[in-house]
Amino acid sequence: MYKRQPERFEEYVAHSRFLRDINNEGAAKNASYKEGLQRLEQFVMVRFSDDTTVRPPESAWFGAHSVPEAGQPARPVPLRQSDVYVRDWLGLAALDKRGALRFHTCDGMHMQLSPACKELVFGQYVGRPRSPGRWLAMNA
C-alpha cells in the first residue's frame, strides 16, 4: 500500500515500506534519517495550489489526515500538530525550533513549475546554474 489512508493506518504501517520508512512511522525509528535532516541548513517544502496528486494537500508540508471518528470525515492535521512533528521522528521540530523550515506554495498543478516557482526554488534555495544558457532553458 503506497497511499497513507488514516482509516487504514495499521495496514499502511504493516505494508508500506517506502513512505512508512522515510517518514519514520514504523515501530523501529531510523536515527540516521533524523540526523541527516538535522544537518540541513534549511528544509524547503513546496506545495502546489491546484495539486490533484498529493492528498491531502497538507501532506506536501508533512501534514496529514486524522483517523476519522465514527460518522465523521477525516480532518486535516497541520504539520505542527502531527505525530511526526510532536514526537520529532524526523527532526522537523528541531529544524523548526532553529528557524530552518520553509513553507512555499507554487501556483499550478503538481510539479508544473512555473518560471516564478523555478526562480523561488532554484534561485533562492538551490542556486542558479553557472551557465546562463541553462537558466534560460529552465525557464522556457
Model-predicted segments: where are they?
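Lipid deacylating catalytic domains
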Residues: 1-140
